[in-house]
Amino acid sequence: MAQRTPRELRLRRHRRVRKKVSGTPQRPRLCVFRSNMHIYAQVIDDTVGRTLAAASTVEPELRASLAGKTKTERAKVVGAAIAERARAVGIECVVFDRGGFKYHGRIQALADAAREGGLKF
């Protein structure tokens, strides 16, 4: 029996969660992806397959404020930015999709910052 890689296990967890979690126009899905260097967050309406708001550490607007910060601090900045952008579009309540990642560290920091920014999970 072949050993599964951590990426395969994460994708398997993500598929299992996605069977049950779906974004609607009233309560879209806040989807998070974490790479070794960056973190990305999108607010998605799954009924039409449209991204309503997005924020990441690769954006030029956020990059200036991220210099010299740790990855967890960067996740907090992205969480605050996604909350601000979602509220600007009129979104108050979301379903959190952690993307198969553990709810710990950078994922938790992003979620907490989004909650502090006014999003309800």
Curated annotation (Swiss-Prot):
GO terms for biological process: translation. InterPro entries: Ribosomal_uL18_bac-type, Ribosomal_uL18_bac/euk. The keyword rRNA-binding applies. Part of the 50S ribosomal subunit; part of the 5S rRNA/L5/L18/L25 subcomplex. Contacts the 5S and 23S rRNAs. This is one of the proteins that bind and probably mediate the attachment of the 5S RNA into the large ribosomal subunit, where it forms part of the central protuberance. Belongs to the universal ribosomal protein uL18 family. This is Large ribosomal subunit protein uL18. It comes from Roseiflexus castenholzii (strain DSM 13941 / HLO8).
